[in-house]
Amino acid sequence: MPKQVLVVDNESGSRRNIAFLLREQGYEVDEADDGLTALNLVDKRTFDLLICDVVMPRLSAFEVVRRLESSHASTSVILITGHPDLLDEKGLGHLPCFTKPFNLYDLLRRVKQVLGE
């Protein structure tokens, strides 16, 4: 059964590129354009991995990760951001993070590592 990945980014081009690459690699991918939509999807399905932009409208990655850690602890998280300085400040410095712009194939390698592949 393919691994379930949720890609969350309000920048549609970035989100679509990540989702396309992951689908090409055989992952089942859902997309969300903000944190609130992401949490609604997480409440309906179980995901192996969440790839999430840090700064988004309606609900930031900080709140999404906090809720995930309390209710879906088995879901791994990779953050993407243009503001890496915010991670330590908000207590998320322990999570893997890619600073925009980043190489999609570097992200793919990290996805495989995080998912134990």
Specify the residue positions occupied by each region the protein language model found.
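Conserved phosphotransfer cores of two-component systems
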Residues: 43-45, 67-75, 86, 90
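Hydrophobic/aromatic residues positioned on beta-strands within the core alpha/beta folds
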Residues: 78-81
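Charged docking surfaces used in two-component/phosphorelay signaling
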Residues: 16-24
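Active-site residues of response regulator receiver
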Residues: 53
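Acidic catalytic/metal-coordinating carboxylates
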Residues: 34-37, 60-66
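Alpha4 helix (beta4-alpha4-beta5 surface) of REC/receiver domains from two-component response regulators
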Residues: 63, 83-100, 105, 109
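Receiver (REC) domain active-site loop signature in two-component systems and cognate sites
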Residues: 56
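Acidic, metal-coordinating helix/loop segments flanking the phosphotransfer/catalytic sites
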Residues: 6, 31-49
